């Protein structure tokens, strides 16, 4: 097993607390690499007794020993990047260790407007996008009309590409009564943005391959969660990129297989926006209690998250398709004082138990959960430092998870701070 490479991924619908473990483990690595997604997924990190909320810059930015890389698989909004750089610097955090791929596709303001318009036109069938332009930018990428960071530095090249890109978009904007975009105005704005981000821009493919050849330690930071993966998630209620298998194509680092994959699992389930959610808690008072105690509101959208019981049937599927080798359990402290804790161990439809994860969204929406009920615990666990000192029923809960998934739990998080993390298994 190559211990120099670690991938950290969310194992549910996002918002699992990945950023905490990137921050926690960053001291052991030379490079922290974001390889997919955009500024649609926020991550929260508590550093130096301050809470930071970022959408684009990787969590490793708080450790000056790390080289923090936004690789080519990311779609980049330069406005967000500059806002976060300013935000970090104003709080005493250096961004001298930040590197941005010149191959990143750029999110323009017309992508954001297209995102909003398409969602509006769907009416009651809207997916619940964050309206950050992610989908339209990825659409341009696969349609071969996308504009990359390297295109921002030559005004004439940039203008020509924007003119080509807006030919069809402006027709659609006009058709649906929206404002059309002036290519020259857009080119001028984004050329200037390009000059501002230029100090961070580098050929990250060469940078990462050089690091790999020198046996530097590299941590890959995933965004969103596997059940939002465009191929393996609850399509179409998913993000626009692959959460799992994009490391090689999203970084340019030809790795046959990363053997060490840390899956971050929330002790219960949450989901933002529309889409099937089999283990959703129907008792609104209990869902409200967990939502408030766990501060379950979107980092980017501020929308209240839907609350559900831990879905082990779903997680078994996630482990199968992702190759997760170890687990970090987060927000276990939120479940303190919940007397009876349900875990979903299977799905049934028409009273028939399923032995597979349905691909059809229509079938999934008709599924009912099969629950096992476990005893809860009343103790406050937020100050406990040793696994042995955790309440017996909490340890039984974790053992149940391990036995069901056949994957070891390595970390147990009992609070948001870095020091509120128990190492169960070295």
Curated annotation (Swiss-Prot):
Keywords assigned by UniProt, alphabetized: Cytoplasm, GTP-binding, Ligase, Magnesium, Metal-binding, Nucleotide-binding, Purine biosynthesis
Residues that bind IMP: 15-18, 40-43, 130, 144, 224, 239, 303
GO molecular function: adenylosuccinate synthase activity; GTP binding; magnesium ion binding
Cofactor note as given: Binds 1 Mg(2+) ion per subunit.
One GO BP annotation of this record: IMP metabolic process
HAMAP family: Adenylosucc_synth (MF_00011)
Lineage: Bacteria, Bacillati, Mycoplasmatota, Mycoplasmoidales, Mycoplasmoidaceae
Transmembrane segments: none
Superkingdom as given in the UniProt entry: Bacteria
Gene Ontology cellular component annotations, sorted alphabetically: cytoplasm
Required cofactor names: Mg(2+)
Homology family: Belongs to the adenylosuccinate synthetase family.
Entry annotation: catalytic residues: 15, 43
Residues where Mg(2+) binds: 15, 42
Gene3D superfamilies: Adenylosuccinate Synthetase, subunit A, domain 1, Adenylosuccinate Synthetase, subunit A, domain 2, Adenylosuccinate Synthetase, subunit A, domain 3
Gene expressing this chain: purA
Name assigned to this protein: Adenylosuccinate synthetase
Organism: Malacoplasma penetrans (strain HF-2) (Mycoplasma penetrans)
């Amino acid at each position: 097993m190559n211990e120099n490479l670690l991938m950290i991924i969310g194992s549910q619908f996002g918002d699992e607390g990945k950023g905490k473990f990137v921050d926690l483990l960053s001291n052991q690595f030379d490079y922290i690499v974001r390889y997919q997604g955009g500024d649609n997924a926020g991550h929260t990190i508590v550093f130096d007794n301050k809470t930071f909320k970022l959408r684009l810059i990787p969590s490793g930015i708080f450790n000056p020993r790390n080289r923090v890389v936004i690789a080519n698989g990311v779609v980049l909004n330069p406005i967000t990047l500059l806002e976060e750089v300013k935000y970090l610097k104003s709080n005493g955090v250096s961004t001298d260790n930040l590197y941005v791929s010149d191959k990143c596709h750029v999110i323009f303001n017309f992508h954001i407007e297209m995102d909003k318009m398409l969602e509006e036109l769907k009416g009651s069938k809207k997916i619940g996008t964050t309206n950050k332009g992610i989908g339209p930018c990825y659409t341009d990428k696969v349609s071969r009309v996308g504009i990359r960071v390297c295109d921002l530095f030559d005004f004439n090249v940039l203008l020509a590409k924007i003119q080509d890109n807006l030919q069809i978009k402006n027709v659609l904007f006009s058709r649906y009564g929206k404002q059309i975009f002036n290519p020259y105005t857009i080119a001028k704005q984004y050329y200037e943005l390009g000059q501002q981000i230029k100090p961070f821009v580098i050929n990250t493919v060469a940078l990462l391959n050089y690091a790999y050849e020198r046996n530097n330690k590299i941590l890959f930071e995933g965004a969103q969660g596997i059940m939002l993966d465009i191929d393996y998630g609850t399509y179409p209620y998913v993000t626009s990129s692959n959460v799992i298998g994009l490391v090689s194509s999203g970084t340019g680092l030809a790795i046959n297989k990363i053997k060490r994959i840390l899956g971050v699992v929330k002790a219960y389930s949450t989901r933002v926006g529309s889409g099937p959610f089999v283990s959703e808690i129907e008792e609104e008072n209990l869902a409200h209690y967990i939502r408030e105690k766990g501060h379950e509101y979107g980092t980017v959208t501020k929308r209240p998250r839907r609350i559900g019981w831990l879905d082990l049937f779903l997680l078994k599927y996630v482990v199968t398709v992702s190759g997760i080798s170890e687990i970090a359990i987060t927000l276990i402290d939120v479940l303190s004082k919940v007397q009876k804790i349900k875990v979903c161990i299977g799905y049934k439809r028409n009273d028939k138990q399923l032995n597979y994860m349905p691909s059809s969204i229509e079938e999934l929406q008709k599924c009912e959960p099969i629950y096992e009920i476990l005893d809860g615990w009343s103790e406050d666990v937020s100050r406990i430092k040793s696994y042995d000192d955790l309440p017996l029923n909490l340890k039984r809960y974790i053992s149940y998870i391990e036995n069901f998934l056949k994957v070891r739990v390595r970390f147990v998080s009992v609070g948001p701070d870095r020091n509120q993390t128990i190492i169960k298994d070295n």
